[in-house]
Every structure is written in structure tokens, then in C-alpha cells.
């Protein structure tokens, strides 16, 4: 597509735009998607699919692919009538076309890792289901009843993948075995989630419902035990020892997470240089914290500062909520457009102990607010604010919550596929990392400790670029960090030197990067593009440039691939 124009016209259409033929195709695809993937309807807070799951079998994957093919065929004969249409057409062709490439490669039959695969998704949807009424618990019981079929379909796909030499690495198989075992054990997720289930006022559920919850929870536990058995007896023996996926497969997944094809070796070299630059910044801040201190010494001083310590998850949650509420209140007054429904953001401690921090968006009508979740590793009960202030901004406002809630609220302009379905890591995570730097520019990280935390997060994302591309493509290790070519073992030591997190979190991140190739660099590469676009727009507009207007205009596009974003904001 070369017709796209600057999306500034999009806002002028707000409230008056009439849906087009291209919007109708996007809406039809979205409705089809909700039928094929009912859990996604729950994610969006759309009623009508509360007990169902997607078909995770090869037949289900093919049904999804066929829906994409039909949608692309329908778009072939349509012409865009405005800027919104041009972006929709560009984005759908890129996203659906790439998804079909991955399907045709067969790698969707090997979807298994420690963070974002059906092994986690089948369980995680319960985190988003209401628990405040009898009917809500009936829906939960119904979905628990369907866990065995969902797991069975998933096992069938993994088995078919193995027959085609499409298998995740042994490391991923083994960690998912551990996770699935924990979900299924006594006191594990399914047991603890349903035992003692009650209404918010403490009222007991009807006896028949309690019995069905117990029966269906036990069935879900048995299903996950069957997954563990399959992984151990069938998939593990077929799984390759090697973690590196190689250049061809990596390039495919990099495009999936970026929406752009980048020169991987140039990007790797940029990542090495960016890491060096951030370390130099950290060294200056360390000297501000204590003259002559190294970065590590400065961090130790910050860790030991009682004013920056939090004890227990309750204290962590309360601190997160207070900081988040303050950011929403202050930033809405001058820097960003934050409307009433967008202002509610809940900070949560996740019901799992896997080590991640993540955001889940609001329901389409905002009746369920956006939430940031902290999955605290077992045994960890002390936290430091200097590291996590920037995390709250990343996950909340002006990061993911502002980004996703802005798109969700743009129903006057965007179709539901643009608002709620399309998600590109390079765009979304790039924005959140851009938002962290933006908070520094706005004066919210003037405290040297908080600024060190932001730089620590930036350093981690730059190190991810080096690690992820270096290890998966087996490139040469930069002289500063060692010799020879990258291996996972060298990579672990490298991460340990560059990511200031607990051992539990480090192990989680290390395994994540190895099992989710191309995703980790998307943060820093997306930030790079966001900053390039912002600077180019500012240069073009000169004194007329207004940051609030630019950010609103950009975020109202929704999440799109990085090439689509650049065309939408820069091409006339």
C-alpha cells in the first residue's frame, strides 16, 4: 500500500464516520473469530461464549486459517474510501497474510513455551472470568467441564507437529511439564480456585453448583495430568536439545512480532551499541547516587534503602495502585487524553507464581477495567520501588493501559478488529517502552533511584535484542561480553550481568526468550521506531507540533504492524 495519508484526518472524522464495506469485512472476520476462539470473547468481555474454548486441534487451526483466507479474498475487490480504510486494509493484509504463512509452515503445530501457548492460555482465561454471581460460577463450571476437550485438541496438534518434525525444544517441554503439574496438583490452581468458592458477600453457592465445580475442576486437573504424561512420554523424546531456531524461522517470527522485516544482523549490531550507550547512562546516575559507585554498588545501595522497600504482596499491590492512580490523575490533566471510562486501572497480584508482569485490557464496554498483574515467584516477599516505578508506568499509564484503552474507546472511528483484535508486540511493547522514556522527559523520574530503575529496564530490553538475535542465529559474541559464538549458557551469564532481577525472574525470562523467538527484541525495536516517527513529525511540524495531539492521533490508530504505523503517520 502506498496510498496512505497522514492519519491526522482520522480524528476530525470522530463521531461522524460511517462504517464502510472494508469495516464490514473486518467486523465479519471479528465475529467469526469470536466463534472460533470463544476465550477471546471472554478476554474482550463479550457475552455469549462463557463456557467454550477454541478447537486447538489441527482441524481447528485449519478452520481459523480458512477464515483468514476468505477474509483476504473479500478484501481483494474493495477500495478504501478514507484514511481509516487504508490503514485497515494495509493492516489486515499484513497480519492475516503473515498468520497464514506461519500456518502453512507448520510451526503452529509446535506452539509450546513457558509463557504464551495453549498450555497457559487454557488455564489463564479463568483469571478474567467474573466470580460475583451464581451465574458467573455456573459459567466457570461450564468452562472447566470443557478443559479436557481443549487439552485433548492441543495434544493432537502437538502430536501432529512431532510427525512433521515441528517440536519445541526440550527446555520448553520440560518447563511446561512443571507448570502443568502445578496447575493439577492438590492446592494447585484448579483446586484452590474452586474449593471454597463463594459469592462476594460470603454466601455459599447452591450445593448442586458446588458439586459440579468440584467434578469439573477434578476433570480439568486430570486433563492437565494427561498433558504432562503426553509431554513426558511422547513429546520430550522427540524434542530437540538445541534451543536456537536459526535464521529462517527466526525471520518469520520476527515479522510476526514487529509487522516489519528487519535486517537481523544490522539490528543485532544496533542492539550491541544501544546496550553500551545505556550502560554509560547508568554509570553517570550511579555516580549521582554515590560518588565513585559502580552501577552494581548503586543498585545495592538502593536495595538497602528502607524508604524504597516493600514487604509482602499486599504492600506491593497497594503501592502499585497508589502510584498508578496518581499517574492517571496527573497525566490526564495536561499530557494525554484520558476519558472517564479509561481512568479506572486495577493493580492485581496474579493467582500464579510464574514470575511475569503483564497487563490485561478492559472489556469493550469498560465494565471490566484494565488490569496490571504481578505473578510473584514462590518464596519472594520483598520488593523495591526504585526498580518498579517504571514498570507501573510501562504496564499502566502512559503505557499499555493508555494505549489499549484509547483504542478500545475509539468505537466512533475504528471497527472492532482494529480496536480489540489486532495486536502487534513491536507496536504495543514499543509504545510502553517509549512511554517509560517519556515519563523521564516529563519529569516523573527525576529521583536518581527511579531513573536508575528506568535505565535498568531499558538495559534489559537492549540486552534482549543482543541475546535473542545472537543466541537464535548463533552470531559472534561482542568482545565486551566474551568470545566465540552465542550459546544459551553464554547467554544466561550475559543476562545475569545485564538484568538486575531475582534468580526466579531471571530463569523465567531466560526460558521465555529461548522459547518465544523474536518477541523479546520487539520492545526495544518498537521503541526505536516510535521515537523515529515522533522526531520526524516534530521536525516537519516545527512550532506547531503538539505532543498531546500526536500521541492521541497515533494511539487512535490501534495496534498495527510497524510498517503500517510508519505509513499511516508519515506518508502523504
Short names for language-model regions:
Residues 1-572:
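N-terminal maturation segment of proteins
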Amino acid at each position: 500500500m502506498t496510498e496512505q495519508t497522514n492519519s491526522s484526518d482520522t480524528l476530525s472524522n470522530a463521531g461522524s464516520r460511517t462504517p464502510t464495506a472494508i469495516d464490514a469485512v473486518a467486523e465479519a472476520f471479528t465475529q467469526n473469530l469470536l466463534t472460533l476462539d470463544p476465550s477471546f470473547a471472554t478476554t474482550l468481555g463479550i457475552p455469549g461464549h462463557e463456557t467454550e474454548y477454541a478447537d486447538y486441534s489441527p482441524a481447528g487451526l485449519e478452520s481459523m486459517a480458512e477464515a483468514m483466507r476468505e477474509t483476504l479474498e473479500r478484501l481483494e475487490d474493495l477500495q478504501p474510501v478514507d484514511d481509516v480504510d487504508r490503514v485497515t486494509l494495509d493492516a489486515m493484509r499484513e497480519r492475516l497474510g503473515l498468520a497464514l504463512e506461519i500456518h502453512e509452515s507448520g510451526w503452529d503445530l509446535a506452539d509450546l513455551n513457558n509463557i504464551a501457548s495453549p498450555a497457559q492460555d487454557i488455564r489463564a482465561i479463568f483469571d478474567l472470568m467474573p466470580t460475583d454471581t451464581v451465574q458467573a460460577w455456573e459459567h466457570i463450571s461450564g468452562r472447566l467441564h470443557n478443559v479436557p476437550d481443549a487439552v485433548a485438541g492441543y495434544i493432537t496438534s502437538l502430536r501432529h507437529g512431532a510427525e512433521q518434525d515441528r517440536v519445541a525444544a526440550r527446555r520448553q517441554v520440560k518447563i511446561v511439564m512443571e507448570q502443568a503439574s502445578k496447575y493439577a496438583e492438590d492446592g494447585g490452581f484448579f483446586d484452590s480456585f474452586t474449593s471454597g468458592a463463594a459469592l462476594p458477600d460470603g454466601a455459599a453457592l447452591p450445593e448442586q453448583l458446588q458439586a459440579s465445580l468440584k467434578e469439573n475442576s477434578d476433570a480439568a486437573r486430570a486433563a492437565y495430568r494427561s498433558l504432562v504424561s503426553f509431554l513426558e512420554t511422547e513429546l520430550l523424546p522427540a524434542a530437540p536439545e538445541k534451543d536456537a531456531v536459526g535464521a529462517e524461522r527466526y525471520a518469520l517470527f520476527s515479522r510476526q512480532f514487529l509487522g516489519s522485516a528487519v535486517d537481523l544482523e544490522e539490528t543485532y549490531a544496533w542492539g550491541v551499541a544501544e546496550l553500551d550507550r545505556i550502560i554509560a547512562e547508568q554509570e553517570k546516575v550511579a555516580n549521582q547516587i554515590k560518588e565513585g559507585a559502580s552501577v552494581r554498588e548503586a543498585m545495592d545501595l538502593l536495595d538497602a534503602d528502607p524508604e524504597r522497600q516493600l514487604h509482602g504482596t499486599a504492600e506491593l499491590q497497594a503501592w502499585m495502585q497508589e502510584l498508578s492512580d496518581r499517574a492517571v490523575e496527573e497525566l490526564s490533566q495536561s499530557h494525554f487524553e484520558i476519558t472517564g471510562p479509561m481512568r479506572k486501572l486495577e493493580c492485581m497480584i496474579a493467582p500464579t507464581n510464574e514470575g511475569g508482569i503483564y497487563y490485561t485490557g478492559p472489556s469493550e464496554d469498560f465494565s471490566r477495567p484494565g488490569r496490571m498483574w504481578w505473578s510473584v515467584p514462590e518464596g519472594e516477599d520483598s520488593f523495591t520501588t526504585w526498580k518498579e516505578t517504571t514498570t507501573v508506568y510501562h504496564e499502566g499509564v502512559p503505557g499499555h493501559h493508555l494505549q489499549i484503552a484509547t483504542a478500545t474507546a475509539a468505537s466512533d472511528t475504528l471497527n472492532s478488529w482494529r480496536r480489540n483484535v489486532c495486536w502487534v508486540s513491536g507496536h504495543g511493547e514499543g509504545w510502553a517502552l517509549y512511554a517509560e522514556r517519556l515519563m523521564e522527559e516529563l519529569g516523573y523520574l527525576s529521583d536518581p533511584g527511579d531513573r536508575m530503575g528506568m535505565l535498568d529496564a531499558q538495559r534489559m530490553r537492549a540486552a534482549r535484542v543482543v541475546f535473542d538475535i545472537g543466541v537464535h542465529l548463533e552470531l559472534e559474541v561482542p568482545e565486551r561480553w566474551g568470545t566465540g559464538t552465542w550459546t544459551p549458557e553464554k547467554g544466561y551469564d550475559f543476562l545475569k550481568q545485564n538484568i538486575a532481577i531475582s534468580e526466579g525472574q531471571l530463569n523465567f525470562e531466560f526460558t521465555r526468550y529461548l522459547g518465544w523467538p523474536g518477541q523479546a527484541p520487539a520492545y526495544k525495536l518498537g521503541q526505536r521506531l516510535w521515537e523515529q516517527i515522533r522526531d520526524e513529525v516534530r521536525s516537519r511540524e516545527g512550532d506547531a507540533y503538539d505532543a498531546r495531539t500526536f500521541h492521541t492521533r497515533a494511539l487512535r490508530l490501534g495496534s498495527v504492524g510497524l510498517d503500517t504505523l510508519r505509513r499511516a503517520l508519515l506518508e502523504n
